[in-house]
C-alpha cells in the first residue's frame, strides 16, 4: 500500500490527485474493456472507468449501474465472481485524518464475503494532469510524498449489532472481526517482480485441445461438492444468466455445451473467458476422443464464431437506421428478445430500442438457425440500408453477444 502524506491530496474518480496537479492511479490490462471505452491500446486507466459510470465516486465504484451498462461489462471482466452484483471496485481508502492510501492492486469488495484482487493485471502510473497526459510508471522512491505501508487495519462494522437489545446478546458479539478479513498483500510493490507481459495472440487458434471438455460436458453435469465451488458456481450461473443465444442449430447439444462453445470462441479472439473454470471442473485427461469428434468440435467452434460475426454485421445496419418497419413481436423467442434488449442498451440504436428488438429478433433467430449472411443481407436490403463497414467496437460487440 502507498500512503500519501502531502497536504491536500485526495481521491477523485479512483485516482490520488496531488496539489501539484499530478495524479497517481492504476491501469488495468484488458483489451476488451479498452475497446468498450473507446481507448487505444490494451490498457484502461482506472479514472476512465470511474468517469464512464457517470457517478461522483472517489475510491470505490459500484459494479452494478443500470444507467451505465459498461460497468456490468467491467464486472464480467474484472471480478473473480462476476455474478455477485453488490460488489464494488476499490482502489484505496481514505483514513479518518484525510490521508489517502492507495492499494498495490485494485480489489473487488463484496458484502457477503472477503475482498479479492481483480482478475486482470494492473500497474501503478502517474500522469502530469487529470487529462492523463505524459503517463509514466509510478515509483515511490521518486516521490517523497508517498511512503510504503505494509498493512493498514481495516475494521468492518457489523450493523446488525446495533439491533441487539439485551446485555447477553451484546456479549455474544465478537470483539473484532479482523480474523474474518483478508487483508491486502503485505509485500512491498517496489520489491515485487514485474508481472509478465500478456501472451501474444496466436496467428491461428487451435481448438482441438478443448474438444475433450466439450464431450465431457455431454456426459456429466457439474455439481457443487464434486469440483471447486467457485468455478462450479461461475459456470452454472453463467449457464442460467448469460447463455441466451444458441449459435449452432444442433438440438442435441446441452445448454452448457453451447456456453462452452461460446467461451472457446472468446478464447480464440483473445478475449476474457471462463474456459479455465471449465478446465478446473472437468479434469479427466485420461478420456480420449476420436479424430472425427475433434474435427466435429472444431467445426462447431468455427460455426459459432461465424454466426456471432454475422449477427454483429446485421445489427450494425439495424442500429444505424433511424426508422425501421414495425413488425409483430416474436413471442416464441423471448431469450433472443431479452438478449437484444441488453445489447441495444449497451450499444444504443438510432431508433427506439423496442422497435429495434422487434425487427432484429427474427433476423438473429434465422442466423442462429444457419441462414447464410448473403441471404440475410439481401433480405435486409429490401427494408434498410446495409452497412458494409464493420464500424467501431467490433470486438466488444462480439464479446457482449457471447456473454449475454
UniProtKB/Swiss-Prot annotation:
It holds the Pfam family Herpes_BTRF1. Belongs to the lymphocryptovirus BTRF1 family. This is Uncharacterized protein BTRF1. It comes from Epstein-Barr virus (strain AG876).
Amino acid at each position: 500500500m502507498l500512503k500519501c502524506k502531502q497536504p491536500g491530496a485526495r481521491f477523485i474518480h479512483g485516482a490520488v490527485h496531488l496539489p501539484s496537479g499530478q495524479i497517481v492511479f492504476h491501469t488495468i490490462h484488458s483489451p476488451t474493456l479498452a475497446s468498450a471505452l473507446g481507448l487505444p491500446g490494451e490498457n484502461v486507466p482506472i479514472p476512465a472507468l470511474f468517469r464512464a459510470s457517470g457517478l461522483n465516486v472517489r475510491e470505490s465504484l459500484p459494479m452494478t449501474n443500470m444507467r451505465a451498462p459498461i460497468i456490468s461489462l467491467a464486472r464480467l471482466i474484472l471480478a473473480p465472481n462476476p455474478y455477485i452484483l453488490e460488489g464494488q471496485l476499490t482502489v484505496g481508502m481514505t483514513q479518518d485524518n484525510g490521508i489517502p492510501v492507495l492499494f498495490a492492486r485494485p480489489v473487488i469488495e463484496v458484502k457477503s464475503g472477503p475482498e479479492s484482487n481483480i482478475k486482470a493485471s494492473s500497474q501503478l502510473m502517474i500522469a502530469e494532469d487529470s487529462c492523463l497526459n505524459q503517463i509514466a510508471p509510478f515509483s515511490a522512491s521518486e516521490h517523497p510524498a508517498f511512503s510504503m505501508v505494509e498493512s493498514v487495519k481495516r475494521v468492518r462494522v457489523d450493523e446488525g449489532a446495533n439491533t441487539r437489545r439485551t446485555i447477553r446478546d451484546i456479549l455474544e458479539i465478537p470483539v473484532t472481526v479482523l480474523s474474518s478479513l483478508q487483508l491486502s498483500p503485505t509485500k512491498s510493490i517496489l520489491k515485487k517482480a514485474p508481472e509478465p507481459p500478456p501472451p501474444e495472440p496466436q496467428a491461428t487458434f487451435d481448438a482441438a485441445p478443448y474438444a475433450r471438455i466439450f464431450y465431457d460436458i455431454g456426459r456429466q453435469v457439474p455439481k457443487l461438492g464434486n469440483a471447486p465451488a467457485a468455478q462450479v458456481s461461475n459456470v452454472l450461473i453463467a449457464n442460467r444468466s448469460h447463455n441466451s443465444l444458441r449459435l449452432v442449430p444442433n438440438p442435441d447439444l446441452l445448454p452448457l455445451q453451447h456456453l462452452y462453445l461460446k467461451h472457446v470462441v472468446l478464447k480464440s479472439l483473445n478475449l476474457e473467458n471462463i474456459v479455465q473454470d471449465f478446465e478446473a471442473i472437468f479434469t479427466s485427461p485420461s478420456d480420449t476422443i476420436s479424430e472425427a469428434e475433434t474435427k466435429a468440435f472444431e467445426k462447431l467452434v468455427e460455426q459459432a464464431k461465424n454466426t456471432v460475426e454475422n449477427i454483429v454485421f446485421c445489427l450494425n445496419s439495424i442500429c444505424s437506421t433511424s426508422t425501421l418497419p414495425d413488425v409483430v413481436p416474436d413471442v416464441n423467442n423471448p431469450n433472443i428478445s431479452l438478449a437484444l434488449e441488453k445489447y441495444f442498451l449497451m450499444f444504443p440504436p438510432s431508433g427506439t430500442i423496442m422497435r429495434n428488438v422487434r425487427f432484429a429478433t427474427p433476423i438473429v433467430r434465422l442466423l442462429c438457425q444457419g441462414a447464410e449472411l448473403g441471404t440475410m443481407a439481401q433480405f435486409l436490403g429490401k427494408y434498410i440500408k446495409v452497412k458494409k463497414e464493420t464500424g467501431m467496437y467490433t470486438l466488444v460487440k462480439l464479446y457482449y453477444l457471447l456473454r449475454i
